[in-house]
Amino acid sequence: MFNKSVNSGFTFGNQNTSTPTSTPAQPSSSLQFPQKSTGLFGNVNVNANTSTPSPSGGLFNANSNANSISQQPANNSLFGNKPAQPSGGLFGATNNTTSKSAGSLFGNNNATANSTGSTGLFSGSNNIASSTQNGGLFGNSNNNNITSTTQNGGLFGKPTTTPAGAGGLFGNSSSTNSTTGLFGSNNTQSSTGIFGQKPGASTTGGLFGNNGASFPRSGETTGTMSTNPYGINISNVPMAVADMPRSITSSLSDVNGKSDAEPKPIENRRTYSFSSSVSGNAPLPLASQSSLVSRLSTRLKATQKSTSPNEIFSPSYSKPWLNGAGSAPLVDDFFSSKMTSLAPNENSIFPQNGFNFLSSQRADLTELRKLKIDSNRSAAKKLKLLSGTPAITKKHMQDEQDSSENEPIANADSVTNIDRKENRDNNLDNTYLNGKEQSNNLNKQDGENTLQHEKSSSFGYWCSPSPEQLERLSLKQLAAVSNFVIGRRGYGCITFQHDVDLTAFTKSFREELFGKIVIFRSSKTVEVYPDEATKPMIGHGLNVPAIITLENVYPVDKKTKKPMKDTTKFAEFQVFDRKLRSMREMNYISYNPFGGTWTFKVNHFSIWGLVNEEDAEIDEDDLSKQEDGGEQPLRKVRTLAQSKPSDKEVILKTDGTFGTLSGKDDSIVEEKAYEPDLSDADFEGIEASPKLDVSKDWVEQLILAGSSLRSVFATSKEFDGPCQNEIDLLFSECNDEIDNAKLIMKERRFTASYTFAKFSTGSMLLTKDIVGKSGVSIKRLPTELQRKFLFDDVYLDKEIEKVTIEARKSNPYPQISESSLLFKDALDYMEKTSSDYNLWKLSSILFDPVSYPYKTDNDQVKMALLKKERHCRLTSWIVSQIGPEIEEKIRNSSNEIEQIFLYLLLNDVVRASKLAIESKNGHLSVLISYLGSNDPRIRDLAELQLQKWSTGGCSIDKNISKIYKLLSGSPFEGLFSLKELESEFSWLCLLNLTLCYGQIDEYSLESLVQSHLDKFSLPYDDPIGVIFQLYAANENTEKLYKEVRQRTNALDVQFCWYLIQTLRFNGTRVFSKETSDEATFAFAAQLEFAQLHGHSLFVSCFLNDDKAAEDTIKRLVMREITLLRASTNDHILNRLKIPSQLIFNAQALKDRYEGNYLSEVQNLLLGSSYDLAEMAIVTSLGPRLLLSNNPVQNNELKTLREILNEFPDSERDKWSVSINVFEVYLKLVLDNVETQETIDSLISGMKIFYDQYKHCREVAACCNVMSQEIVSKILEKNNPSIGDSKAKLLELPLGQPEKAYLRGEFAQDLMKCTYKI
């Protein structure tokens, strides 16, 4: 690529342009394929004794063929050597040797057998007499089968004294006996790909491991490779059993800081990142070498990750069971494991001895835990204890037929999903271990990826069993899938605790489940079945109990709206944890602040998580409440492997090595081996020793128990209140009461963190108030009714005077039978400058009856006079509206004839004639005088003159032609039409021309207006235009009214109601009852909203539907009885003839809510509601008067008798047994009527009364009092017939003490009778 030659190399290998003269020789081993392999970084030929004409160089390595004869010089690749240049590599020194091959940046391209070349990158100069080959950055690509050679180390390697090839950065790809790579050697008999093995491929070196196919010659032995962390295989080293190695859990450094093991070449040491688990690809020792030492070495192999340093290019967690699937990229492990402190050596950036404290402390704490077996705890619970995430612990096969076929695939998929979760969690662990900077970087990356993740609804979702496995299951198996888990990477997961039915998603499990049925949102919520229509019942489908785990759930600062991930803020996390525990219907399980993992249990599915974003907000008030609750003892947070070590736990060394841990690891969760089973017998020997004041005397004990200072519930704390002087001590109780009162006011005050607004039934708004004591305030919204006269009671009285009110046929509620309401009545209360005055004035002109000062008996004359009067009023009103517009044009015009025409627009013929005479246009003054005469001859002559001008081609002034057109009586028809004036004048000006100069005698006023509207389109949102349209519609007024109401809001509710009622009662237009009631409902509601209850009640009387009128009037009176019974509005109820029963019932309801039961009964009696009055006496008034009665004066009982006497005799005969009990009881107490009939009536009625109303609190107490009175009367008289009534007396609703006393009296009477006998 950059080294062009005749036989130049390509980027990933050389392309030979010469034809080979010989074929590849047979390999020396049957395992070696006779082909030329090209690796990722160059050609790696393992063909021994091969004659290749053109050995090509790769990108990073060059081909070397030991014992081969090169026919032409080898051309180097991108970083390869050039022949005949004995110079060093990139940083290598020049060697004084006889060889002509130099080291390259990434290795040597040695084509000779015995030569001494310079070292590669970072290698020192070598002056070695023996044959030496140099190591490159990625190792040498040599096939030298010479055991006496010595190769120098690569980038970080040290020279070895053994006859082995030099190690590269990622290991050697050679066939020498022993190779030492940077991360260890892996010399096997099989080929290795970039990330693992690929059987059947050529023996080419991998990216991160060596793939040296060892082919020893005759007489040579094959060396074994070091696979343990120390670079040697101690299973092959003979040593005494007494020389036991140190414990694998002990520190690698002794007291003096020296390593127990000899330092090995760094190339030979394989390290593992934090995300790695137990290595699964460590080779086992040979069976023939089994010994104690070998077994210890096996343990070392299994735990080498916990003692290996965390290097830059340490491989991630290997998964050998995934059929060659690679792990996470190594660069991720490098950047996810930044060191907080790094002290490099002089010659290496890695420590040569010792190990990383982070790797030792946090690599995998599960290996340092003791094995505890508890049958009562499942493996899933233990897994949640360590990581907070669920995992599948067992696989329940749905059918025996697919157990042998699908089990391996299912296990692989399950492990894959779990490993992805573990790798991500371990990356988070490294973030928290390495400090805030790495946490910020990770959060930044997560934030950048969040937008991309949200773009795809199914991005990051996974489930177990996987969708592929589910597709292979039958419908019967899908109906009950156990251990189903579904989640989303970075969001959380759901573990269903019962079998789920997945038959509804057989169309596509991936499309139906991921992001459609199960939705994990970035708002820390999860939703299953977002569509309620498709949501099954509880217990079906996915709507079963489950355990939900949400990730990255942190408290949010209320001010900055940013999550608080600093775990040192214990107070904030405690408050946040308390909020999570108090979530309703989400049974809290655990919360891990390191990672923000929140686990909880739900019984069914809806939207779960932080549904309300304010639940995660933490402010100073929450922290102050936490502090006000008293100083709690500091609790040590139980941390997992994600916990961050403190600075005191870290000891850094300055000699180039990392410090080791000191002390005990606090992050290890200690579990007890067992928990003893306790029974009641275990507590028999334990004596309670309460520190309470007790006494054997019951009286003294009650005094002690009643004392607030010695209460067992009183909190014992020292007095720390303000006590600055003697006044505080003297009035401490008073100060405490004041403080308590302030505290109560503060607690009762509404202090919600959010703003709110709520409408009440009275059309009032309840809002938050930060000033008032209650924290809320009631506000009234502004009404649309802006007409002030509506708020005047005088206007309401005038309206009531103009209507006739009668009772309806089906109910006693009022109805307006006749009305003489006119638009002009409202004009008297309006200001002439208001915007509504012109509208109501026009309506009065068009719709109100016209009155004239004289009478006539001829109907035709009357109609003509009425028409003329209305026409005159209408044109006068229009002139007043267009006057300013025309006057402005007259002032701006200099043409006298044009000014004459403008005067005619104002129907001012006098001024127009005067101007015509002054301007020497006398003929025009004569013609103008005929305007408005409606003479047919004048109209014909004017029309004839216009035709002559048109046919003769005469040039005539347009203003003169306009005047002639007005004389013709059809200004907007025929020749010289004035429709072109539409762009110059308003539509009201043109309408005035039609009304003033049209054929008014031939047509009615409505028809004349309609003819003009047919020629011009009026603006639909102009209320004046709408009124003209309604006036011209005549018979179709209601239809046009509905269309206008649907199209525009030009007419307000009040005007529409007034228009309909005026036209309906005057008989000028016809409106249906439905249209009238619709307008009445709307106007009455608007008046009620404006607190004009009297006006609303008056308008409601216009309703035609009797049932609707009854409901509306009743609701209004019952709700607003207080305002309607006020002194200013009391006459309205009488004038509107509201039923008295409704008024008194409404007042009684008000008294009941206020607790005035006596007034309630009195109002019910006044309203003749005897049934309601009887119920009120039985349940409320009677028991209360009896319980509050003074036995001496009996005033309350006398009041009760007066109330009962107000019932008419016809109603007294209908009394129930319950109210009759009070009447008989009053006779017994007030009148001393103690006859047997009275007592029997009381006893029998008392039982019925009690059984029927015992749910009322006052009734039970009242019956007890009356029963005691009955028993006392009987016992005082010593009635001889008492023996017959003993059973009945004991059935009275007496208390237990009273019944016991009564039984005792009966027993004494029995003993007396026996003694006498």
From Swiss-Prot:
<dbReference type="Pfam" id="PF04096">
    <property type="entry name" value="Nucleoporin2"/>
</dbReference>
<keyword id="KW-0653">Protein transport</keyword>
<dbReference type="InterPro" id="IPR021967">
    <property type="entry name" value="Nup98_C"/>
</dbReference>
<feature type="region of interest" description="Disordered">
    <location>
        <begin position="249"/>
        <end position="278"/>
    </location>
</feature>
<dbReference type="GO" id="GO:0031965">
    <property type="term" value="C:nuclear membrane"/>
</dbReference>
<keyword id="KW-0597">Phosphoprotein</keyword>
<feature type="modified residue" description="Phosphoserine">
    <location>
        <position position="414"/>
    </location>
</feature>
<dbReference type="GO" id="GO:0006607">
    <property type="term" value="P:NLS-bearing protein import into nucleus"/>
</dbReference>
<dbReference type="GO" id="GO:0051664">
    <property type="term" value="P:nuclear pore localization"/>
</dbReference>
<feature type="compositionally biased region" description="Low complexity">
    <location>
        <begin position="17"/>
        <end position="30"/>
    </location>
</feature>
<feature type="repeat" description="FG 1">
    <location>
        <begin position="12"/>
        <end position="13"/>
    </location>
</feature>
<keyword id="KW-0906">Nuclear pore complex</keyword>
<keyword id="KW-0813">Transport</keyword>
<keyword id="KW-0811">Translocation</keyword>
<feature type="repeat" description="GLFG 3">
    <location>
        <begin position="136"/>
        <end position="139"/>
    </location>
</feature>
<feature type="modified residue" description="Phosphoserine">
    <location>
        <position position="403"/>
    </location>
</feature>
<dbReference type="GO" id="GO:0036228">
    <property type="term" value="P:protein localization to nuclear inner membrane"/>
</dbReference>
<keyword id="KW-0472">Membrane</keyword>
<feature type="repeat" description="FG 2">
    <location>
        <begin position="79"/>
        <end position="80"/>
    </location>
</feature>
<dbReference type="InterPro" id="IPR025574">
    <property type="entry name" value="Nucleoporin_FG_rpt"/>
</dbReference>
<dbReference type="GO" id="GO:0006302">
    <property type="term" value="P:double-strand break repair"/>
</dbReference>
<feature type="region of interest" description="Disordered">
    <location>
        <begin position="390"/>
        <end position="450"/>
    </location>
</feature>
<dbReference type="GO" id="GO:0046822">
    <property type="term" value="P:regulation of nucleocytoplasmic transport"/>
</dbReference>
<dbReference type="GO" id="GO:0044614">
    <property type="term" value="C:nuclear pore cytoplasmic filaments"/>
</dbReference>
<dbReference type="GO" id="GO:0000973">
    <property type="term" value="P:post-transcriptional tethering of RNA polymerase II gene DNA at nuclear periphery"/>
</dbReference>
<feature type="region of interest" description="Disordered">
    <location>
        <begin position="133"/>
        <end position="165"/>
    </location>
</feature>
<dbReference type="InterPro" id="IPR036903">
    <property type="entry name" value="Nup98_auto-Pept-S59_dom_sf"/>
</dbReference>
<feature type="repeat" description="GLFG 5">
    <location>
        <begin position="168"/>
        <end position="171"/>
    </location>
</feature>
<dbReference type="GO" id="GO:0016787">
    <property type="term" value="F:hydrolase activity"/>
</dbReference>
<keyword id="KW-0509">mRNA transport</keyword>
<keyword id="KW-0677">Repeat</keyword>
<dbReference type="GO" id="GO:0006405">
    <property type="term" value="P:RNA export from nucleus"/>
</dbReference>
<feature type="repeat" description="GLFG 8">
    <location>
        <begin position="206"/>
        <end position="209"/>
    </location>
</feature>
<feature type="repeat" description="GLFG 2">
    <location>
        <begin position="89"/>
        <end position="92"/>
    </location>
</feature>
<dbReference type="GO" id="GO:0016973">
    <property type="term" value="P:poly(A)+ mRNA export from nucleus"/>
</dbReference>
<comment type="function">
    <text>Functions as a component of the nuclear pore complex (NPC). NPC components, collectively referred to as nucleoporins (NUPs), can play the role of both NPC structural components and of docking or interaction partners for transiently associated nuclear transport factors. Active directional transport is assured by both, a Phe-Gly (FG) repeat affinity gradient for these transport factors across the NPC and a transport cofactor concentration gradient across the nuclear envelope (GSP1 and GSP2 GTPases associated predominantly with GTP in the nucleus, with GDP in the cytoplasm).</text>
</comment>
<feature type="domain" description="Peptidase S59">
    <location>
        <begin position="458"/>
        <end position="605"/>
    </location>
</feature>
<feature type="compositionally biased region" description="Basic and acidic residues">
    <location>
        <begin position="418"/>
        <end position="427"/>
    </location>
</feature>
<feature type="region of interest" description="Disordered">
    <location>
        <begin position="1"/>
        <end position="36"/>
    </location>
</feature>
<feature type="repeat" description="GLFG 6">
    <location>
        <begin position="181"/>
        <end position="184"/>
    </location>
</feature>
<feature type="modified residue" description="Phosphoserine">
    <location>
        <position position="273"/>
    </location>
</feature>
<feature type="repeat" description="GLFG 1">
    <location>
        <begin position="39"/>
        <end position="42"/>
    </location>
</feature>
